[in-house]
Swiss-Prot record:
Belongs to the bacterial ribosomal protein bL17 family. One of its GO terms (biological process) is translation. InterPro entries: Ribosomal_bL17, Ribosomal_bL17_CS, Ribosomal_bL17_sf. It holds the Pfam family Ribosomal_L17. Gene3D superfamilies: Ribosomal protein L17. Transmembrane segments: none annotated. It comes from the Bacteria. It comes from Streptococcus thermophilus (strain ATCC BAA-250 / LMG 18311). GO terms for cellular component: cytosolic large ribosomal subunit. GO terms for molecular function: structural constituent of ribosome. This is Large ribosomal subunit protein bL17. The keyword Metal-binding does not apply.
């Protein structure tokens, strides 16, 4: 399997990919370097495919990769309680149902201007 090293050790690289994949699930669009965007695309496509399957095993596989971060939080005045949605819940309840008729190609990479400090090629990766 071919992949990009991204100038990091394997554990650091996996952590970066997990973080960026979780951020993309939560925000649905992020700005990063082109190389990272192309690597994130692979992991996000796999997570959405797991979300489309929707069974317990798929949910556990996705939970092993996606970070346990809060995607949204709301306050109910009647019960005086906060309710929150995690990135995994958002993946399975909001994002995956959008793509039931689509076979792959869930993300779009748009190239933008180079980063100011080091002229690294930047890109916006977003869910279609």
């Amino acid at each position: 399997m071919a992949y990009r090293k991204l100038g990091r050790t394997s554990s650091q690289r996996k952590a970066v990919l997990r973080d960026l994949t979780t951020d993309l699930i939560i925000n649905e669009a992020i700005v990063t370097t082109e190389a990272r965007a192309k690597e994130i695309r692979k992991t996000v496509e796999k997570m959405i495919t797991l979300g489309k399957r929707g069974d317990l095993h798929a949910r556990r596989q996705a939970a092993a990769f996606v970070r346990n971060e809060i995607a949204s939080e709301s306050y109910d005045e009647a019960t005086d309680k906060y309710t929150s949605t995690t990135a995994l819940q958002k993946l399975f309840s909001e994002i995956a149902p959008r793509y039931t008729e689509r076979n792959g190609g869930y993300t779009r990479i748009l190239k933008t201007e180079p980063r100011r400090g080091d002229a690294a090629p930047m890109a916006i990766i977003e869910l279609v």
